[in-house]
């Protein structure tokens, strides 16, 4: 049995074992809850104050939120409170440029890049990102928009790619000051709705484990997983994908980083080949805008480090609006 197929079985087993625990509101071993926001009720409002080790998650936690009156407002208020509590129970790192973070988030993210290769340059708008939101205290969904690809060559056809989806189930986490670490199961997928030139033509599943560990201002975030076309595909083949990001919180709003992004091809047209990219980058944020809404930015350049590569360079720009 090949490596990627074994990995798919392993990912399914991990999700089966962890699912009952994922849906609980408590976090960590021993069933003890991680620190949460302390809420003080007043006649006209509710004020949430962060506990020690929760600072920096959202400046808006120190602000006063009007008490909801209608049914929809109460549901929205409870959902936002769940998001604040969930983020308080995990590290407060910024998401890397290319590596998927194991943190659970509520944010709108838009990525764009320009890559160059033997066939010329290509612009991508969307980058497989979109709206990320919580559906349970330890479960997050992402619904993306099909990315739009625009070649730079005169006369070349542009078009939309497939619809990206993602589920995150947090298995373990500790906030800063209490371990600063996490482990998350990720299941990505693409729905074949794109143009034939830029879509895969088949659904693709991408199971992975995301990990992270911080020490002071330094943290390491990474993922290891695969890309598995449903029903097999002689063109795409199976892929083993590994990403690791080393990040440093240099100043209040600056997060320089360096990533290693590797893909090992099994079957398909690139069977037996591998490609590795080094990705220096810089993150900026989070800047409080209003209420729970914040702004963060990131940019980086992937540089091919192996003889075989499907493209030479990729300059990436990422806009995030956490809420």
Predicted regions span which residues?
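Sec/Tat signal peptide C-region and signal peptidase I cleavage site
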Residues: 19-25
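N-terminal targeting leaders only when they are immediately followed by extended low-complexity/repeat-rich tracts
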Residues: 4, 13, 28-31
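Transmembrane beta-barrel domains of Gram-negative outer membranes and organellar outer membranes
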Residues: 26-323
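Bacterial N-terminal signal peptides
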Residues: 9-18
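Bacterial N-terminal signal peptides that target proteins for export
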Residues: 1-9
């Amino acid at each position: 049995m090949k490596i990627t197929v074994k990995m798919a079985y392993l990912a399914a087993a991990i999700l089966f074992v962890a699912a009952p625990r994922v849906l609980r509101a408590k976090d960590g071993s021993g069933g003890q809850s991680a620190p949460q926001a302390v809420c003080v009720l007043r006649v006209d409002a509710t004020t949430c104050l962060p506990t020690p080790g929760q600072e920096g998650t959202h400046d808006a936690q120190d602000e006063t939120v009007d008490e909801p009156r209608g049914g929809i407002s109460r549901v929205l208020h409870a959902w936002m409170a769940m998001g604040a509590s969930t983020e308080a129970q995990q590290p407060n790192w910024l998401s890397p440029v290319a590596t998927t973070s194991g943190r659970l988030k509520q944010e709108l993210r838009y990525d764009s890049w320009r890559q160059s290769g033997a066939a010329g340059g290509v612009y991508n708008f969307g980058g497989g990102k979109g709206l990320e939101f919580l559906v349970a205290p330890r479960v997050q969904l992402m619904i993306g928009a099909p990315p739009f690809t625009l070649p730079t060559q005169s006369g070349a056809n542009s078009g939309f790619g497939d619809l990206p989806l993602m589920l995150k189930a947090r298995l373990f986490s500790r906030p800063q000051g209490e371990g600063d670490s996490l482990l998350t199961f990720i299941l990505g997928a693409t729905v074949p709705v794109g143009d034939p030139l830029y879509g895969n033509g088949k659904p693709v599943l991408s199971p992975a484990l995301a990990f992270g560990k911080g020490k002071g201002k330094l943290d390491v975030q990474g993922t290891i997983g695969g890309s598995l076309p449903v029903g097999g595909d002689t063109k795409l083949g199976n892929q083993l994908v590994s990403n690791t990001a080393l990040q440093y919180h240099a100043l209040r709003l600056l997060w320089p980083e360096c990533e290693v992004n590797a893909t090992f091809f099994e079957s398909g047209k690139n069977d037996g080949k591998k490609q590795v990219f080094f990705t220096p980058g810089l993150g900026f944020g989070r800047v409080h805008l209003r209420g729970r809404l914040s702004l963060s930015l990131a940019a980086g350049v992937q540089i091919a480090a192996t003889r075989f590569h499907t493209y030479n360079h990729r300059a990436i720009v990422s806009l995030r609006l956490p809420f």
